[in-house]
Amino acid sequence: MAATALLEAGLARVLFYPTLLYTLFRGKVPGRAHRDWYHRIDPTVLLGALPLRSLTRQLVQDENVRGVITMNEEYETRFLCNSSQEWKRLGVEQLRLSTVDMTGIPTLDNLQKGVQFALKYQSLGQCVYVHCKAGRSRSATMVAAYLIQVHKWSPEEAVRAIAKIRSYIHIRPGQLDVLKEFHKQITARATKDGTFVISKT
């Protein structure tokens, strides 16, 4: 098991720059092959690819981003994105919840941390940028957890809602499984508190 995890982590490192170049290409190419770098999911949360330094002003000034949830490992953002200290100088708080690229599944604990982080900024009327490398899997899983918490949706409903806005997300079976565990926790807690309402969407 440990050997498999090491192999997967090593493969993710080897493929990082080739797959990032592909993401950059899809962000620049016109027509049907084009993929927007990020999308606004609701008044609080934006889901996207790496927040490159060139996007900083747009995110902070235009999108009112005051929190960033980074699902990447440190090596993925070292040269291309603001450091935690640089974000802080801009008035932005960064929460890093490192998850291996391509095969990684966010932990249940990290989903809970990320959701509470987003809810904090929701209460302040400010926005949170949730990202991984391409904004398709790791970060989409986190945003799905946030929607489950906010709307009491099922994992499938949350994923469908995101896909309507950002059609090229890709939630893997293991990621859906952890969302089901998260939903189970939310449902149990809400039922105990008498606040659970079955979604009609």
From Swiss-Prot:
Which keywords accompany this UniProt record? Answer: Hydrolase, Lipid biosynthesis, Lipid metabolism, Membrane, Mitochondrion, Mitochondrion inner membrane, Phospholipid biosynthesis, Phospholipid metabolism, Protein phosphatase, Transit peptide
Task: Name the cystine pairs.
Answer: none
Tell me what topology the record assigns in the membrane: Peripheral membrane protein
User: Which Gene3D superfamilies does the record associate with it?
Assistant: Protein tyrosine phosphatase superfamily (3.90.190.10)
Active site (UniProt): 132
Q: Which Pfam families does UniProt cross-reference here?
A: DSPc
Chief location of this protein within or outside the cell: mitochondrion
Would you tell me the protein name for this molecule?
A: Phosphatidylglycerophosphatase and protein-tyrosine phosphatase 1
The gene that this protein is the product of is PTPMT1
